[in-house]
Design a protein with these regions (language model features):
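Short, proline-centered helix/strand-breaking motifs
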Residues: 74-80
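Predominantly the C-terminal beta-signal and adjacent terminal strand-loop region
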Residues: 37, 45, 49-54, 125-181
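Short glycine/proline- and aromatic-enriched beta-strand/turn motifs that initiate or cap beta-hairpins
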Residues: 1-30
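Membrane-spanning beta-strands of outer-membrane beta-barrel proteins
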Residues: 20-24, 70-72, 94, 136-138, ...
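Residue-level signature of outer-membrane beta-barrel architecture
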Residues: 29-33, 81-83, 107, 147, ...
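Transmembrane beta-strands of outer-membrane beta-barrel proteins
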Residues: 2, 23, 38-42, 75, ...
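Short loop/turn motifs that connect adjacent beta-strands in outer-membrane beta-barrel proteins
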Residues: 32-38, 84-96
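Extracellular/periplasm-exposed beta-strand and loop segments of Gram-negative cell-envelope proteins
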Residues: 8-19, 49-71, 108-142
Length: 181
């Protein structure tokens, strides 16, 4: 599966965070019982997530803008609920609208933080083996609607993204295209 996502972080002391567009892609392992109303799947996805925000002024009265980007391997385990009964002419499950819901765990494999003041950027790269500011594990709940080869998915993060400081959680909306080979 491959697609685009928009993500943001809810940060407890900052109400000026914005969604930012990025990429997601990976593989799906599906257990589809024949002619059942339920199924299950496990996805392994690469997902770039983050946010941009304005955080006040510096000592010279210049506005400060932050951009946080993080790179995750996410593993959602989803229950598939088929929204109508199978018919004789149904060749495959992709033609039946589906609701997918379940938990997701994410592993931060890197990221960077950019601080921009007066058009000048200062960037800090974070790798998983560094003691950076990102927590390595993220978890949340995922819900999706799928039809044919298109899926719209929302992930509500529940883990704190940063090791220290304000409480912040990931929120991701993605649209993906997938095929079964």
């Amino acid at each position: 599966m491959v697609g685009a996502n928009i993500s943001t972080m809810s940060i407890s002391d900052n109400d000026s965070t914005r969604f930012r567009p990025d990429f997601t892609g990976g593989v799906r392992i599906a257990l589809i019982p024949e002619r059942s109303i339920f199924g299950a799947e496990i996805d392994v996805l690469y997902s770039r997530q983050g946010t941009s925000s304005k955080k006040g002024l510096d000592d010279d009265n210049n506005s400060i803008r932050y951009l946080e980007k993080s790179h995750y391997l996410t593993v959602p385990v989803l229950l598939n609920i088929y929204l109508r009964k199978w018919k004789e002419e149904d060749e495959d499950e992709s033609k039946i609208p589906r609701l997918r819901i379940g938990p997701q765990i994410g592993f931060c494999i890197g990221g960077n933080e950019v601080k921009e003041v007066k058009g000048r950027r200062k960037q800090q790269f974070i790798t998983p083996w560094e003691k950076g500011s990102f927590n390595r594990i993220d978890y949340g709940v995922t819900a999706a609607l799928s039809y044919w080869f298109v899926e719209v998915r929302y992930t509500f993060g529940m883990a704190n993204v940063f090791k220290e400081g304000e409480k912040s959680t990931n929120h991701v909306i993605s649209v993906t295209w997938s095929d079964v080979w």
